[in-house]
């Protein structure tokens, strides 16, 4: 027995030395072959993981400061992963657009992508057949060719928001959240929602949990993905307790919406929405139930946050920079009449270029969305840097959108900056919808909805700052559902108040 133990010590020691030698050789070979841009100094094993702030706003500022120090690109090492941050539109356009076929996949995130989604959330899917099929179906149903199919939902939800602004102006933030959730819910599942809708609240809650999983270091298996493949008992995998719970709750919430739609269809109600069109085309016969449920559900998650945050930014920009509102009204009054003759309609937007510019500025100014990395599917070289397949490349959105070298007076809400842009391409000039072949597939409908709402809100309402409650500029706003700042809303005139009451009251009645 003693002899065996005495032999085990040198054997184990030799194996450990061989492993260290192997890892050392692999490390030097890797860094001899590949060259990352401006690798930010970190600590052994963890890299920069412990340096990155957990708070979202603080993290945006931290990344912005690194961009000022290192320039257009820098690299953070988070555990065993390398993240390259793009800090200029030039670099982002070159890599994500011009070389989009190489940067088409998603970073490997075991926690949100595998454990909490089982590979079924489109936003986390790697490049492959399922991702291509789902993108094709979404484009087929809600792409540019069908932009008018869902116009009735956009019209009625914008009218409901106007009426809520008129009757409950202090609840503008909740009204924005209701509008965003109800619009996307009606587009996807054919159901309108009220403030405090219980299933919407549950979906938002699980989506917030997904967003927390993006925080660097929030889950050990995202920083050290190899841990996901070690067959450990579930009892000592705390990430699975969290992720499994989010998946089960998401499946339950999404299934409830599918079952509700099926019941309405059995009752003979004519419901035109993404899922009903999906079924009409027979696409539901080609995938399993859970994948179908998550396809619809993740459209809800993706659409509601973006719309709500954009509306909050519009309110803040209009209150802080009333000159932009006055400029917009010059065009609106020419089209709709200065004395509240009628509401702007979707058909008017083509004659309102400044409204389109406001839409772009809303999606640029001080806005903060989660960064979801693109992942290289093959090695690439760029300006002396050599990047391996699997490298994560992230657009530093808030930092670039608020960078004076990219945008003149970035703290200023100034739609005029986009008047010389191609206003018929809403995704140009900012990256709020993403970029390249991973651009949001619903950007056409989202842009149309935003333009209509901007036109109607600026035509009918005044926005005022509240003394003693300054609106912060130059600091990222959180994506949470709480009221981000104080703003006073009033009708533009008694005539405009009467117009909203007459034209919008019926839309605010939700069953």
PLM regions and their residue ranges:
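N-terminal membrane-proximal hinge/A-helix region immediately C-terminal to the signal-anchor transmembrane segment
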Residues: 2-118, 133, 155-160, 249, ...
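Central I-helix of cytochrome P450 enzymes
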Residues: 180, 189, 246-257, 281-333, ...
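Conserved cytochrome P450 catalytic core segment spanning the I/J/K helices
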Residues: 143, 219-222, 242-310, 341, ...
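Conserved cytochrome P450 K-helix/beta-meander segment immediately N-terminal to the heme-binding cysteine loop
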Residues: 395-422, 504-507
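Cytochrome P450 heme-binding "Cys pocket" and the immediately downstream C-terminal segment
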Residues: 104, 194, 322-324, 443-484, ...
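Cytochrome P450 catalytic-domain helical core, especially the substrate-recognition surface
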Residues: 41-64, 82, 110-189, 204-260, ...
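Conserved cytochrome P450 K-helix E-x-x-R motif and the immediately C-terminal K′/meander segment
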Residues: 50-64, 69-71, 322, 341-383, ...
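Cytochrome P450
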Residues: 1-19, 77-84, 147-156, 165-186, ...
